[in-house]
Amino acid sequence: MTATTRERRSQSPARGAAAGFPSQPGGPDATPAPAISNECVFSALGDPAQAVQSLARELHSRRPGQAPAAVVFFCDGLYPLQALADALSQRFSCPLLGCTSGGQIGPGGFRRGGLSLLACYGSGLRLGTHLIEPVSQAESAVERIARALADRPLAPGWRRFGLLLVDGLHQGEERLAHALYHGLGDVPFIGGSASDEMRFEHTPVYFDGRFRSNAAVFGVFETSQAFEAFRVQHFVPRRERLVITEADPERRLVIQINGLPAAEVYAGALGVPEAVLSPELLEAHPLLLRMGDELVVRAISRVTRARALLCMSAVETGVLVDIGDAGAALEALQRGFDAVESRIGEPALVLGCDCTLRRRQAERDNQLGAIGDFLARHRVFGFSTHGEQFNGLHINQTFTAIALAAQP
């Protein structure tokens, strides 16, 4: 299943505690900037200063005399994070956007551990970052972002999109994504919840020289290139008619389905006893919610002692849900990328947020190498997440991405 959002021509307001945008390229009649130019580098070194130094050396060897205009990075949460933040902020004077990850995606496909970094060069892509802290203050933060963007009109032919990075342990993504989408309107965005290899211990985001918990950073990119936001998931519905008759969205609990304990109904639909509802089985059969013509995924984390289903995104009382069966993940990606490329051409860069559960399923299916190779061939730079955002939605077990065209 694939959903897309094409770039939008008119732009609306955005935010407050902010870092970055370089000056506008010329006045209101400025011509579009050159095509996007970037380099992806990776270090497995465990010492943060050495890791950053090695990446800076590699970038210098590829682009002697050039400094990046923007940097996006994803890192292992086991680094001493303040030391890493210090090394990054000392080495790079441009806007920085990053967080801890459950693994990275880049030219080498999927990677675990270490530090991955995307350096963007030239004036074809600009980045400004906006802090939302704490996550619960989403609405007031979005108002500040909106005012900041309204004060910065775009040159003709330029557009904006967003990349949201949010602490994956504070369960505020639904409210945050909704606030951003409705508060900014014409800024399509994707996002990912910071991860830590499923340890669920510490998943901070980076802003202005340090890593911050219970926070989010909204990166606003400006470009004259065509782009498209899209998402891909590979689950097909079983055609079960299930009604959520009791839920606790704040705690992401589904308590009853069709008036019975949720675990009982779920297991019955799968034709198995409740006792065998293992993490692997739950991951293979998430809940599916229909929104218009699209299906969105709600991953199930575990069955509680009270026989409720603890989900990784909120589910409301009264909604109709189905149960998904896993289809072919690689083929779903191929269809998604084919559709996007038919509209904007071959991308110069794809920023991607891919659920850690998708990677785990690929490992179990012996497909990790093939899927990683596919993403590398399609110039994806991104990370494995605790959850994904797509415009106003917080979802699970999905690949969300922004593809930037090689041509304007």
What function would you assign to each model-found segment?
Residues T2-P408:
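Hydrophobic alpha/beta core scaffold segments
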